[in-house]
């Protein structure tokens, strides 16, 4: 039985992960953590998420180290925000706890700080902008399209709910990174357009971010040239697709001793 701690326990992703873990053989929720001074601290997290009692009280992140030690957690799952996630990763890795990180919006410095702690403490971690299985097939397909349609104009469009904190999405940034890594030409990423921009340059890969309503996550990459257009799209209609992928990552990382992995590793797409 793999003992799992979940941060952001009452958030959209955290509560879904807790529910799915309780329904999954071989996994056990042993700690649920949310923001400091949370008014529901101490209450059973199962009751707070509509599952009924599961015997795990809601803890807060200011007591993370003590909670991880007491619970004996082997894997910690984090879908929160960039700054607290870095601190969580540093604390967990110091205690030898493996990590599944789905938080996005890291600066390069934050990402480096987090990865340094993971490597220094010799734990295993999966870090991904999107754990949905389908979106990772989308990423894999992008590799081929960028190689074969590299002389086309390329635009990326992403849409998310109005509450999303970062833009563009981590998934859109990852798509741009994959495209750049597979093009046989120079390229540069720009973000939206405004004013008199002049003629589009061949090097541009432009990311457009839309926000509104309750859109879980839509991503499209558009390849255009004279006479034709090819669009590759992925739409998340329920966060369960992300949750299910994260649970696969928990099982994967629980078997690893150290190293930093991504969802291509989890799904054997490399």
From Swiss-Prot:
Active site per UniProt: 160, 164
Pfam families, alphabetized: DapB_C (PF05173), DapB_N (PF01113)
GO biological process, one term: diaminopimelate biosynthetic process
Signal peptide (residue range): none
GO cellular component: cytoplasm
EC assignment: 1.17.1.8
Primary location recorded for the protein, binned into one broad class: cytoplasm
UniProt record similarity statement: Belongs to the DapB family.
Binding positions for (S)-2,3,4,5-tetrahydrodipicolinate per the UniProt entry: 161, 170-171
Protein name as it appears in the record: 4-hydroxy-tetrahydrodipicolinate reductase
GO molecular function per UniProt: 4-hydroxy-tetrahydrodipicolinate reductase; NAD binding; NADP binding; oxidoreductase activity, acting on CH or CH2 groups, NAD or NADP as acceptor
Free-text function comment from the UniProt entry: Catalyzes the conversion of 4-hydroxy-tetrahydrodipicolinate (HTPA) to tetrahydrodipicolinate.
Bilayer-spanning residue ranges: none
Catalytically driven reaction(s): (S)-2,3,4,5-tetrahydrodipicolinate + NAD(+) + H2O = (2S,4S)-4-hydroxy-2,3,4,5-tetrahydrodipicolinate + NADH + H(+); (S)-2,3,4,5-tetrahydrodipicolinate + NADP(+) + H2O = (2S,4S)-4-hydroxy-2,3,4,5-tetrahydrodipicolinate + NADPH + H(+)
Residue positions binding NAD(+): 8-13, 34, 102-104, 128-131
């Amino acid at each position: 039985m793999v003992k799992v701690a979940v941060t952001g326990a009452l958030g959209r992703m955290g509560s879904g992960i807790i529910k799915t873990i309780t329904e999954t053989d071989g996994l056990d929720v042993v700690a649920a953590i949310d923001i400091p001074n949370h008014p529901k601290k101490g209450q059973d997290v199962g009751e707070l998420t509509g599952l009924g009692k599961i015997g795990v009280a809601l803890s807060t992140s200011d007591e993370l180290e003590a909670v991880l030690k007491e619970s004996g957690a082997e894997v910690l799952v984090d879908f929160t925000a960039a700054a607290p996630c870095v601190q969580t990763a540093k604390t967990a890795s110091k205690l030898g706890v493996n990590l599944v990180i789905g938080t996005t919006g890291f600066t390069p410095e934050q990402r480096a700080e987090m990865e340094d702690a993971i490597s220094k403490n010799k734990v295993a971690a999966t870090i991904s902008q999107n754990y949905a299985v389908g979106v990772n097939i989308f990423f894999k397909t992008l590799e081929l399209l960028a190689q074969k349609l590299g002389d086309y104009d390329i635009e990326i469009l992403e849409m998310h709910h109005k509450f999303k904190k970062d833009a563009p999405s981590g998934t859109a940034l990852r798509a741009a990174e994959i495209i750049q890594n597979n093009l046989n030409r120079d390229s540069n990423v720009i973000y939206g357009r405004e004013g008199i921009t002049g003629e589009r340059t061949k090097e541009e890969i432009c990311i457009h971010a839309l926000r509104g309503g309750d859109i879980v996550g839509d991503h499209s990459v558009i390849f255009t040239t004279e006479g034709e257009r090819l669009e590759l799209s992925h739409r998340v209609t329920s966060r369960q697709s992300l949750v299910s992928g994260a649970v696969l990552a928990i099982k994967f990382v629980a078997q690893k001793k150290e190293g930093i992995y991504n969802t291509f590793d989890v799904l054997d797409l490399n």
